[in-house]
């Protein structure tokens, strides 16, 4: 998996101060996407063990609330294995940090994916330019914030 951005301090993508990872690769290609440079799977740099160590060193700080994973599309088949491994590692070493994940896929499509075991909050749904709104965490009214409680059938949607 490649990534186009690893931000040590992010206050725009989830609550508090967070670390954010922007993965490369997206086949959805939403019209009006805020990040079209992320569509190419080869854009940016390869996510390596060194990248993981760097990301974890950022999460080590007490004032960091968690990790936000955006894209691109983190749940593309090419990205999903690395995203799962990353989330599993973060939850193992930082169980009190939250993981937020943005996806252009709907919650019904992703709710049973293995990665969802590690996600605390998902922002789900494709960006639809005709439904554009100004929201702090998503860009169109069809998208949802879903806070997961550990029981996929007991999630809280915003």
Language-model features: where?
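N-terminal pre-triad scaffold of radical SAM enzymes
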Residues: 2-29
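Conserved C-terminal portion of the radical SAM core fold
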Residues: 60-69, 93-94, 123-133, 154-158
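A generic structural signal for alpha->beta connector loops
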Residues: 96, 118-119, 142
């Amino acid at each position: 998996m490649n990534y186009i951005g690893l931000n040590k301090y992010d206050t725009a993508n989830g609550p508090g101060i967070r670390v954010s990872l922007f993965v490369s690769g997206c086949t959805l290609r939403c019209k009006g996407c805020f990040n079209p440079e992320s569509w190419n799977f080869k854009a940016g740099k390869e996510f390596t063990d060194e990248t993981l160590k760097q990301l974890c060193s950022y999460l080590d700080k007490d004032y960091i609330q968690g990790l936000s994973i955006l894209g691109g599309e983190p749940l593309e088949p090419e990205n999903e294995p690395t995203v799962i491994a990353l989330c599993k590692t973060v939850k193992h070493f930082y169980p009190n940090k939250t993981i937020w994940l943005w996806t252009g896929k709907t919650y019904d499509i992703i709710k049973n994916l293995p990665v969802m075991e590690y996600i605390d909050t998902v922002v789900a749904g494709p960006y639809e330019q005709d439904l554009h709104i100004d929201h702090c965490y998503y860009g169109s009214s069809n998208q949802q914030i879903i806070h997961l409680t550990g029981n996929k059938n007991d999630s809280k949607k915003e």
